[in-house]
Regions:
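Conserved PLP-binding catalytic core of the aspartate aminotransferase-like
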Residues: 65-116, 120
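PLP-dependent enzyme catalytic core of the Aspartate aminotransferase-like
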Residues: 109, 113-162
Length: 162
């Protein structure tokens, strides 16, 4: 049987007694509107950070190819193919330089497989295994983007030299 949430009067067929909390409902609506405005502002900041990062990577590694649609993409996400190196080698080298990234999809962390998402996009396995994915949930500063792009430039240059 269904038990009443609150005891008391007979509102809601005796299952939920009490007067509706109008002030609480209004406060909730105001809070949701403010939260939505903050989310939209953060979305714009993430898009600007992502685009700044993409531009910086393209500047320091012109051979790198951005994966996915150039316009319709997640705000805090950039994925590249780096010809001539494996994503795993690039990942290890970047980690040694203090940069955290991934060579596969977020749902496959810890597995050493070719990213299924890239294969589904039509990339050949030999190309897909040279992927590097960078994700962030807070906007990046210009200094952070420069640090990341410098590390990518040095790492990619070192790895393609050998």
């Amino acid at each position: 049987p269904i038990e009443p949430v609150l005891s008391g009067g007979g509102q809601e067929r005796g299952l939920r007694s009490g007067t509706q909390n109008v002030a609480g409902a209004v406060a909730l609506a105001i809070g949701l509107n403010e939260s939505n405005a903050r989310m939209q502002a953060q979305y714009r900041e993430l898009v600007a950070s992502r685009d700044m990062l993409i531009d910086a990577v393209r500047r320091v590694a012109p051979r790198a190819d951005l994966t996915g649609d150039p316009e319709r993409r997640l705000p805090g996400h950039a994925s590249f193919i780096f010809p001539g190196v494996t994503g795993e080698a690039l990942l290890v080298d970047l980690d040694a330089r203090g940069i955290a990234a991934s060579s596969g999809s977020a749902c496959a962390i810890g597995r050493h497989e070719i990213p299924a998402t890239l294969l589904a996009m039509g990339l050949e396995p030999s190309i897909a295994k040279s992927a590097l994915r960078m994700t962030f949930r807070k906007p990046l500063t210009r200094e952070q983007v420069e640090r990341i792009s410098l590390a990518i430039e040095e790492s990619y240059t070192d790895l393609t030299r050998h």
